């Protein structure tokens, strides 16, 4: 889920290092701190370059810059859009390798009880180690704990891998879609919305 409405599109210790590969020790998910912003920015840049690699030209991909994303995350953590917005990070030991942002849905048909996974990403080098499932489970628990009874998220219509992952976690398409312009050249991508009742959402397994 590489986009985000309320946080950057995707803050003491600075974990802005290249993600480790191989065996993962002490994997966890937690609420982000302000000092995590540099690491989250780097992860988001890598996630976006990977997600849009077959959609955008290389010169646009090169503009996905960790420090730029980090500045926006730092501002969002210092002054959240609302008390119901939360940024979570996934860690391998002390190293941030993924992130998830949750909050109220901004969709036109949303109610006060409609929550949204606004962003979810794991660094490409750290995937297949359970971080995505751990972050999604933490995101669902966080939304439920803040009084939301549904969760939604938007994904690229062509992203079959993410679609399968979210289907397995209990989300399903609700027929909503949108077309977004994602660069100054006017490139348009289609996104579809997946939703789940938080009373029935299952625990995700990566």
Which residues does each PLM region occupy?
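Conserved catalytic-core motifs of GNAT/GCN5-like acyltransferases
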Residues: 152-155, 163, 167-193
């Amino acid at each position: 889920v590489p986009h985000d409405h309320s946080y950057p599109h995707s803050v003491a210790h600075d974990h802005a290092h290249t993600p480790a590969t191989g065996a993962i020790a002490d994997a966890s998910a937690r609420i982000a701190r302000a000092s995590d912003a540099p690491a989250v920015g780097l992860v988001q840049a890598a996630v976006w370059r990977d997600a849009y690699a077959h959609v955008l030209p290389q010169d646009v991909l090169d503009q996905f810059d960790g420090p730029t994303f980090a500045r926006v995350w730092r501002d969002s953590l210092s002054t959240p859009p609302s008390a119901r917005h939360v940024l979570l990070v996934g860690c391998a030991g002390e190293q941030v390798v993924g992130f998830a942002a949750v909050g109220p849905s901004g969709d036109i048909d949303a109610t006060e009880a409609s929550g949204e996974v606004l962003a979810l990403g794991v660094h490409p080098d750290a995937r297949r180690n359970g971080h995505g499932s751990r972050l999604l489970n933490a995101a669902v628990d966080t939304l439920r704990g803040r009084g939301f009874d549904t969760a939604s998220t938007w994904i690229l219509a062509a992203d079959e891998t993410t679609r399968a992952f979210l289907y397995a976690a209990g989300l399903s398409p609700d027929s909503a879609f949108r077309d977004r312009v994602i660069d100054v050249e006017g490139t348009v991508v289609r996104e579809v919305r997946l939703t789940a009742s938080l009373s029935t959402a299952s625990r995700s397994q990566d």
